[in-house]
């Protein structure tokens, strides 16, 4: 039995401009090689681009994009009796949001375009409209979970 204390889960701090934890989570996910100022520059300029294109509040569009890309269920590989089963598992909202942010960023990195600002802005706009690469990934995950529904009784 471990004697170590269970660490208290820290919530992410809100960012300085939009006062949003979601924006800060997004900045930390964009981050590469410790260049946080560049990551925040990319996200803030993408938000300005969204405001310029839609004339709406960009933080609401970001929140809507993340909510629409958030999966409710995922699959985990479970080894039972010498064979691997893809078992559908419900996930917590925090985990779902972090997956959605990750999928939004990978989909925006795969896009063709001038730079990351425009690619991220377009991916967020598409996700808010229920299209785009991140939404496709979410639907694919839900399809896989539905296909493997028979193995749901192997839950963890």
Swiss-Prot record:
Location in or out of the cell: Plastid, Chloroplast
Location, primary (coarse class): plastid
Disulfide bonds: none
Gene Ontology molecular function terms on file: rRNA binding; structural constituent of ribosome
SUPFAM superfamilies, alphabetized: Ribosomal protein S7
Cellular component terms (Gene Ontology): chloroplast; small ribosomal subunit
Domain of life: Eukaryota
Entries under InterPro entries matching the protein: Ribosomal_uS7, Ribosomal_uS7_bac/org-type, Ribosomal_uS7_CS, Ribosomal_uS7_dom, Ribosomal_uS7_dom_sf
Keywords: Chloroplast, Plastid, Ribonucleoprotein, Ribosomal protein, RNA-binding, rRNA-binding
GO biological process: one example: translation
Reported function: One of the primary rRNA binding proteins, it binds directly to 16S rRNA where it nucleates assembly of the head domain of the 30S subunit.
Self-association state and partner proteins as the record states: Part of the 30S ribosomal subunit.
Family: Belongs to the universal ribosomal protein uS7 family.
Record-given protein name: Small ribosomal subunit protein uS7c
Record organism: Chara vulgaris
């Amino acid at each position: 039995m471990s004697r170590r204390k269970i660490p208290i889960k820290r919530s992410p701090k809100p960012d300085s401009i939009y006062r949003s934890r979601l924006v800060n989570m997004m900045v930390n996910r964009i981050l590469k090689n410790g260049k946080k100022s560049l990551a925040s520059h990319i996200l803030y300029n993408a938000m300005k681009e969204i405001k310029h294109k839609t004339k709406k509040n960009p933080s609401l569009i970001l929140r809507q994009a993340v909510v629409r890309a958030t999966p409710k269920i995922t699959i985990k590989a479970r080894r039972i009796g010498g064979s691997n089963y893809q078992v559908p598992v419900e996930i917590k909202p925090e985990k779902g949001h972090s997956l959605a942010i990750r999928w939004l960023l990978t989909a925006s990195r795969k896009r063709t375009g001038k730079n990351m600002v425009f690619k991220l802005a377009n991916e967020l706009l598409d996700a808010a409209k229920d299209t785009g690469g991140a939404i496709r990934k979410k639907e694919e995950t839900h399809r896989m979970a539905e296909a493997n529904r028979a193995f749901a009784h192997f839950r963890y």
